[in-house]
Amino acid sequence: MEHLTLGPLTRATGTVRLPGSKSISNRVLLLAALANGETRVRDLLDSDDTRVMLQALRTLGVAWRQDGPDYIVTGAGGNFPVKSAELFMGNAGTAIRPLTAALALQGGSYKLSGVPRMHERPIGDLVDGLRQVGAVIDYLGNEGFPPLHIQPASLRIDAPIRVRGDVSSQFLTALLMSLPLAQSASGRIEIEVVGELISKPYIEITLNLLARFGIEVERQGWERFILPAGTAYRSPGEIFVEGDASSASYFLAAGAIGGGPVRVEGVGMASIQGDVRFADALNRMGANVMAGDNWIEVRGTERDDGRLHGIELDCNHIPDAAMTLAVAALFAEGTTTLTNIASWRVKETDRIAAMATELRKLGAVVEEGADYLRVTPPQPWQTPADGIGTYDDHRMAMCFSLAAFGPLPVRINDPGCVAKTFPDYFSVFAGVTR
């Protein structure tokens, strides 16, 4: 197996220009494809997940081209030209879930599949929501999971659509992004969220981007969303993709652990991404944080020993970036407890179990529950002979690069898995650490 040995590292300082946000990139691509008009997308993330979406759109007959670093998407006006297709979605949840909803409105026959892990990631709540309005969707494997077969159907929306919000916010995002194209006798469509809605900041990203494409959604708390029916999406002409706030977390944590200053550019106080609030968590752990509209900078703690201190944090607002805190906890005095992270279990891997397993290899004392993780730093540090497993999960690999600030080298297995969102992560990380 390919591996990469890092550290021990003692210092982090420098500036990083972030790659585009995965969450924003794939939303923008689909909205641009559904819109009327041509959209120039600037700073689109170049990664496995965006390539999956781009290839799917091309298969569906959507025209796009590159113009230097930009992508120009010619919208299909809500109607994909190709009415029968088989689409391979890799392990891109941000692609398969919104596309499932969009394709259910197309009146065509589509099969969607992915890698084996994708076939273990739930999609049943979204399918249930679409079936409520007449969509015909069959499971080709296990009930509630991809692969799927979407068949021609005429959707009828005459009552509120109910969807669970406690497994993944992507189900709600998928409905919000597609249902404005549907018809309703009342001229509006209501979505009711059943249960506690997790990862609310990702819904805020969706609502913000819908507004950029001319769709205004009325939000009544986090329980009810009212959309205009039979609406055409309008291209904004040009749209910029923010830097990825989840990817920013690794460099900001490096600044906190390795002294800093480390500055990330591409996200800041003006960001629409909830994960920028990761910097607040570092501040609570004792790091020094500064920020502008489009940048964040972190330095280490003022303590003589340079150590952070453990915290207890409800992570519902930063579900992806919270993973970085679990590794940063190795360098904190006391115990760090991360709660409200049940969504980790249905991501690229079961991230609670994976994180607990790999932290224990380094000597940490870890307690895991259904929706929490409690981490106490190693006494003493250990270095696993078999390295750190990454589970084909980009965020596991990037998180554990921070373990190289410990007193022993750390071996990262399958470092190439970062290609999902940040192909050159390790070279960028090397540029700000020593």
Swiss-Prot record:
PROSITE patterns: EPSP_SYNTHASE_1, EPSP_SYNTHASE_2
Residue positions binding phosphoenolpyruvate: K22, G93, R121, Q170, R351, R395, K420
Source domain of life: Bacteria
GO annotation terms (biological process): amino acid biosynthetic process; aromatic amino acid family biosynthetic process; chorismate biosynthetic process
Any GO CC annotation of this UniProt entry: cytoplasm
Binding site for 3-phosphoshikimate: K22, S23, R27, S168, S169, Q170, S199, D320, K347
Subcellular location: Cytoplasm
UniProt entry tagged with the keyword Transport: no
InterPro entries reported for this sequence: Enolpyruvate_Tfrase_dom, Enolpyruvate_Tfrase_sf, EPSP_synthase, EPSP_synthase_CS, RNA3'P_cycl/enolpyr_Trfase_a/b
EC number: 2.5.1.19
A molecular function (GO) term: 3-phosphoshikimate 1-carboxyvinyltransferase activity
Reactions catalysed: 3-phosphoshikimate + phosphoenolpyruvate = 5-O-(1-carboxyvinyl)-3-phosphoshikimate + phosphate
Transmembrane portions of the chain: none
Pathway the protein acts in: Metabolic intermediate biosynthesis; chorismate biosynthesis; chorismate from D-erythrose 4-phosphate and phosphoenolpyruvate: step 6/7
Record's keyword terms, sorted: Amino-acid biosynthesis, Aromatic amino acid biosynthesis, Cytoplasm, Transferase
Enzyme class: transferase
Active-site residues, as the UniProt record annotates them: D320 (proton acceptor)
Subunit structure: Monomer.
Described purpose of this protein according to its UniProt entry: Catalyzes the transfer of the enolpyruvyl moiety of phosphoenolpyruvate (PEP) to the 5-hydroxyl of shikimate-3-phosphate (S3P) to produce enolpyruvyl shikimate-3-phosphate and inorganic phosphate.
Family: Belongs to the EPSP synthase family.
Protein name in UniProt: 3-phosphoshikimate 1-carboxyvinyltransferase
Organism expressing this protein natively: Cupriavidus taiwanensis (strain DSM 17343 / BCRC 17206 / CCUG 44338 / CIP 107171 / LMG 19424 / R1) (Ralstonia taiwanensis (strain LMG 19424))
Organism phylogeny: Bacteria, Pseudomonadati, Pseudomonadota, Betaproteobacteria, Burkholderiales
